[in-house]
């Protein structure tokens, strides 16, 4: 079991559901103060009601002004920030590259990559003044193996890795660490939806679609969202104090994606 030696002050983007909610729950279970955001007010409020002590803001991570307000609101009640989890992301269009609109490309990059820059930019001074901080960026296993038809998504998530490595070098002298987690096939509504869409496209049942995906994962396994939460807690703990600049797969070793 990983114990946090002190009450961590944590900001998690897109924390209202899915992986973000699982990460929030993991930190709450360790006694952390947690501030989340979500673009959907109904989703956000439902999560806040579900988890005692959780606070949050309605935020479009692709909007720099929204992000400035998010960080300001979180810092006002927490008094600082020890951990930033950049989890917000969208799947973007599913299409051949030549058919992707400029609008869809720009929106995907804006949320998935620019949003992380906005968040890091707005907490950097606070962490520098503290001489400590942990930043965790959520990328994807697709960043390693590519994914035809999803070029904006993959490009944005590869960009996340470059940002992660650069932040680790640039801010390491100030005691700030930065790592990326690369999840695989997540066993939640979104992950199952991906398989359902694949099944419809191929005119096969869900079980056959599942076999098609799992055969390219060495451990033949789904990933539970709570596992990503547990890894994030580990990286933010004293046990992870010398881990920085790393891209860590939580994917059962994805060999290929279809």
Describe every region a protein language model picked out.
Residues 180, 188, 204-239, 243, ...:
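C-terminal helical subdomain
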Residues 4, 91-94, 145, 221, ...:
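Short C-terminal tail/terminal secondary-structure segment
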Residues 120, 156, 164:
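Active-site helix of classical SDR
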Residues 16-18:
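Conserved glycine-rich cofactor-binding loop
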Residues 172, 177, 243-245:
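Short, small/polar-rich loop/turn modules that mediate ligand/substrate recognition or access, typified
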């Amino acid at each position: 079991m990983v114990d946090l030696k002190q009450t961590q002050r944590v900001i998690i983007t897109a924390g209202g559901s899915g992986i973000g909610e699982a990460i929030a729950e993991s930190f709450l279970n360790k006694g952390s103060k947690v501030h989340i955001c979500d673009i959907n007010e109904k989703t956000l409020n439902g999560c806040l009601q579900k988890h005692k002590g959780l606070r949050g803001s309605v935020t479009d991570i692709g909007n720099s002004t929204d992000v400035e307000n998010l960080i300001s609101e979180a810092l006002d009640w927490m008094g600082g920030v020890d951990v930033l989890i950049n989890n917000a992301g969208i799947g973007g269009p599913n299409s051949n590259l030549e058919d992707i609109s400029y609008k869809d490309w720009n929106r995907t990059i804006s949320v998935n990559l620019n949003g992380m820059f906005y968040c890091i930019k707005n907490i950097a001074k606070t962490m520098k003044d503290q001489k400590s901080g942990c930043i965790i960026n959520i990328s994807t296993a697709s960043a390693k193996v590519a994914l035809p038809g999803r070029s904006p998504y993959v490009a944005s998530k590869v960009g996340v890795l470059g940002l992660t490595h650069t932040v680790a070098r640039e801010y390491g002298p100030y005691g700030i660490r930065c790592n990326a987690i690369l999840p695989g096939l997540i066993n939640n509504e979104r992950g199952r939806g991906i398989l359902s869409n694949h099944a419809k496209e191929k005119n096969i049942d869900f079980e056959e679609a599942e076999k098609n995906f799992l055969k390219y994962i060495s451990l033949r396994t789904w990933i539970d969202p709570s596992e990503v939460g547990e890894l994030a807690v580990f990286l933010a703990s004293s046990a992870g104090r010398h881990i920085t600049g790393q891209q860590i797969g939580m994917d059962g070793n994805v060999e290929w994606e279809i």
